Amino acid sequence: MAMFTVLPLIWLAPLGLISLFFYYIIPYFWNYRHLRSIPGPLFARLSNWWLVYACREKSRWKYVNDAHTRYGPVVRIQPNHVSIANEEVINAIYGHGNGMLKSSFYDASVITTYSIFTSRDRAEHSRKRKVVSHSFAPQSMRNFEPFIQQHLNVFLQKWDAMAANEAKFDGYADVESRVWLNYLVLDIIGDLAFGAPFGVLAKGSEVVDFETEKGPSSLPVITSLSTRSEIAATVGALPELKPYLKWSPDPFFRTGFNGMINLRTLGTSRITDRLNNPPGDEREKDLLERVREGRDHKGQPFGKGELIAEALTVLIAGTDTTSSTMAALLYHVVRTPGVLKKLQAELDEAIPADVSIPSFEMVKNLKYLGFVVNEALRHHSTISLGLPRLVPENGNGVTIAGYHFAPGTVLSIPIYTVHHLKEVWGPDADEFKPERWEDVTQRQKQAFIPFSHGPRACLGRNLAEMELKVITATWARRYDLIMRDDTMEILEGLARKPEAVNVGIRRRM
């Protein structure tokens, strides 16, 4: 009897090895044999779990960048996913008219229904873009500027109070600037996309109160955004995981799932409240109102479900990316010798002395400010991962970078790596150096894709540029800053987010 009990246990090891052989090795030699000549980490060539692990570690950018350093510009980072660190093929993968489609990676980011960001169907994306695109046109930015000014004024009140009342022995007050910039951008985006600010800036807290069908509720919005971003990037590497997240023994996945549920609840509550209580005529047209006015090719507006999806897209894309870039920009400007003083000199000359918050018109064409913003976008690369594209299934494949890729192959260009290529940006590519934009080359312009490229590029670029320039100009002109902590730890989800940026501030004399 004991012999029959032991025998099944003895067979477990060989059965496990046989299972692994059929699950990983056979597909490697058969399904993806056309990619066998492309180098990459062995585990990445065999399994999707290499990239899942890199994302789970919140360091995908580092794993992929290290792989390119070791294996070259064309690297397999999944069995059917090739990463190409070559600026010359950006248009071939992301440009107009090439037939490339978004991959299943984007399914992991769907919270309610497909949005303009997550939609993979070309016709559906075109319909959504027609409804939404006018809302982000340059002429719309004039209507959005008062919202930025209003919340920036509250931000200054908070920082002025800290500078006046919490100064240390050296005259500088300690500030964790990343979280305050996050509060600021959250209230701006909340006001624009949901019809009212979240109130996090005034409270100095990430907890947002809202009404649901069951009564009053609250949630930590920054935490929810961060965990949702991390889970979307991780599950995007293996979308088959999504239905099982809430049962995962790993708290990382359960927390990310809860973040998605939190955001869905918040978005539904805020949009429902806005539709039931429309604003008066005295309020400037916000982003939500402009999207509501939009019409598709058949003259139809978005329904409530699509409004929620698009508002959440603006919240997620517009908050994490912009606030992370602002925090990294502040860190490098304060940390890099001479940059803050040079920026302050330009701002002092351009902005009248009695103006606390400059208009976008005052700062949009300032040369050095533009260099600083561009260098922050390049050096930090908030969106650092390669946005995956699928070679169309109904064609003959494509030849890119000297390789032929069969239909169904996933391709991407790692933005962080391309933004740090020494053959493009020079031997000082890893340094923060705004002056490099003084004589930027055509090759560098081609390699600079902080908002992606082509028909699926970020629609919010104009809004992000206005926020970055107006907000940076405001704090840089108003305060002197010193570093309190010279390190800046990075956590990556869909965006590379500084964990904290600790500085000292004081009002300028």
Swiss-Prot record:
Keywords of this entry: Heme, Iron, Membrane, Metal-binding, Monooxygenase, Oxidoreductase, Transmembrane, Transmembrane helix
SUPFAM superfamilies per UniProt: Cytochrome P450 (SSF48264)
Induction remarks: Highly expressed under trichothecene-producing conditions.
Family as reported in the entry's similarity comment: Belongs to the cytochrome P450 family.
Phenotype upon gene inactivation: Results in the loss of butelonide production.
Record's function text: Cytochrome P450 monooxygenase FG08079; part of the gene cluster that mediates the biosynthesis of butenolide, a mycotoxin that shows antibiotic activity but does not seem to play a major role in the spread of head blight in wheat. Butenolide is derived from glutamic acid via a 4-acetamido-2-butenoic acid intermediate.
Lineage, broadest ranks: Eukaryota, Fungi, Dikarya, Ascomycota, Pezizomycotina
GO molecular function, one term: monooxygenase activity
EC annotation from Swiss-Prot or TrEMBL: 1.-.-.-
Transmembrane segments: 6-26
Any one of the GO CC terms: membrane
Identification of the protein by name: Cytochrome P450 monooxygenase FG08079
Annotated positions binding heme: 458
Keyword check for Metal-binding: yes
Subcellular location, record wording: Membrane
Source species: Gibberella zeae (strain ATCC MYA-4620 / CBS 123657 / FGSC 9075 / NRRL 31084 / PH-1)
Record pathway: Mycotoxin biosynthesis
Membrane topology label: Single-pass membrane protein
Stored InterPro entries: Cyt_P450, Cyt_P450_CS, Cyt_P450_E_grp-I, Cyt_P450_sf, Cytochrome_P450_monoxygenase
